[in-house]
């Protein structure tokens, strides 16, 4: 058994401007750095996290570094944990991306990827965890697509339901 905690990355300037970041490697904002070092750090004190995985995008990795500064917990970056590539809609208003998100489950965003491709990446990542991290508690710091992949593959929630709901940036899963 593996316990997986999920935490969304801290705030970025794109989040604050309500833009769809996708694969844009945007930095944390000042508020995001405070959020990671404060409330997000406190949330995981005393939980016995063995290993941390983040996407390879700065906003996720920097969130982990700030949350676990001074602690001796390994942090690994993995590109499979990236947000969806929104292609031409990257750094466009989130409303534009959300307007075509349902169509993008199986059809890629223009010059980007489909949400199913994100789910496939996440399935591959989850499958790799099982033989290598049995008995551990891991934390994944990622994005909406990362969480949807966990919810879809671990809990069996349909992607159509996940994308129509409100994004909650934490979760706990057992595999």
Q: Which stretches of residues belong to each language-model region?
A:
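Glycine-rich phosphate-binding loop signature in dinucleotide/nucleotide-binding domains
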Residues: 44-48, 129-136
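Short beta-strand scaffold positions
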Residues: 54-55, 120, 141-142
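Domain-level recognition of soluble alpha/beta enzyme cores
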Residues: 155-175
């Amino acid at each position: 058994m593996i316990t997986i905690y999920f935490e969304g990355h801290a705030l970025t300037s794109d989040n604050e401007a309500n833009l769809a970041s996708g694969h844009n490697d945007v930095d944390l904002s000042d508020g995001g750095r405070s959020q990671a070092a404060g409330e997000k750090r406190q949330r995981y004190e005393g939980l016995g996290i063995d290993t941390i995985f983040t996407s390879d995008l700065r906003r996720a990795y920097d969130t982990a570094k700030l949350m676990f500064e001074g602690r001796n917990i390994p942090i690994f970056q993995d590109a499979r944990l990236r947000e969806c590539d929104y292609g031409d809609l990257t750094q466009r208003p989130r409303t534009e991306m959300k307007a075509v998100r349902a169509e993008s489950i199986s059809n890629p965003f223009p010059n980007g990827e489909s949400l199913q491709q994100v789910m496939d990446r996440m399935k591959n990542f989850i499958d790799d965890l099982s033989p290598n991290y049995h008995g551990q508690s891991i934390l994944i710091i990622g994005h909406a697509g990362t969480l949807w992949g966990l919810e879809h593959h671990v809990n069996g929630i349909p992607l159509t339901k996940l994308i129509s709901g409100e994004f909650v940036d934490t979760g706990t899963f057992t595999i």
